């Protein structure tokens, strides 16, 4: 399955969740697109589970095959499967770059990683799905600091709250991973138990 690259606001309206963050077009029309978008449709248990899974996939920009592998890994870990799944998704490098305020959206964060602007523990990493670990240090490459995205990131530092499991160090935009997130530190509007129920069938 190819990665979705279509209109993200339309997808947000279909899934009834802001997939971008601060999407004003979605805020104006937070109902499904199309002629009957406002109509109330009786939603089955399966449909609710499917929608929740799709919300998670599109929020983090993950394809179905990869998402299923994440679920299997989460299910094999000790603890709650749903929370494990969210922790795996949050620890992706593209998400950490977004969470740290180095990018305005996860899509932009994915591009910044893919284009080789980031170092993890002084080694270039250009794989968005790379998983960070506790005590990792993420830096912007020296020559990339002067590019527009990172200039904007410096100027807008403090505009968006940084989660407690991360720390951003001043003008150099160094990101310190103090720990992997607890469920209470993950503010995505997802009911992860519905995802677990979807894959448990």
Curated annotation (Swiss-Prot):
One of its GO terms (biological process) is ribosomal small subunit biogenesis. The keyword RNA-binding applies. HAMAP family: Ribosomal_uS4_B. SMART domains: Ribosomal_S4, S4. The keyword Ribosomal protein applies. It comes from Rhodococcus opacus (strain B4). This is Small ribosomal subunit protein uS4. It holds the Pfam family S4. Residues 91-155 form the S4 RNA-binding domain. Keywords: Ribonucleoprotein, Ribosomal protein, RNA-binding, rRNA-binding. It comes from the Bacteria. Signal peptide: none annotated. One of the primary rRNA binding proteins, it binds directly to 16S rRNA where it nucleates assembly of the body of the 30S subunit. With S5 and S12 plays an important role in translational accuracy. PROSITE patterns: RIBOSOMAL_S4, S4. Part of the 30S ribosomal subunit. Contacts protein S5. The interaction surface between S4 and S5 is involved in control of translational fidelity. GO terms for molecular function: rRNA binding; structural constituent of ribosome. GO terms for cellular component: small ribosomal subunit. Belongs to the universal ribosomal protein uS4 family.
């Amino acid at each position: 399955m190819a990665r979705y690259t279509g209109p993200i606001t339309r997808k947000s309206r279909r899934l009834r969740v802001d997939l971008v963050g601060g999407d004003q077009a979605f805020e104006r029309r937070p109902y499904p697109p199309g002629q009957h978008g406002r109509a109330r449709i009786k939603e089955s248990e399966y449909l609710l589970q499917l929608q929740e899974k799709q919300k998670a996939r599109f929020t983090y920009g993950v394809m179905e095959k990869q998402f299923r592998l994440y679920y299997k890994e989460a299910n094999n870990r000790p603890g709650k499967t749903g929370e494990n799944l969210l922790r795996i998704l949050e620890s992706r490098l593209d998400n950490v770059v977004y969470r740290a305020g180095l990018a305005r959206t996860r899509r932009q964060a994915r591009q910044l990683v893919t284009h080789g602007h980031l170092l993890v523990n002084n080694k270039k990493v250009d794989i968005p799905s790379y998983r960070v670990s506790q005590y990792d240090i993420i830096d912007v490459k020296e020559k990339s600091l002067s590019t527009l995205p990172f200039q904007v990131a410096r100027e807008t530092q403090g505009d968006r709250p940084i989660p407690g499991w991360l720390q951003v160090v001043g003008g150099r935009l160094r990101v310190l991973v103090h720990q992997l997130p607890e469920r209470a530190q993950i503010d995505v509007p997802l009911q992860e138990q519905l995802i677990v129920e979807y894959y448990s069938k």
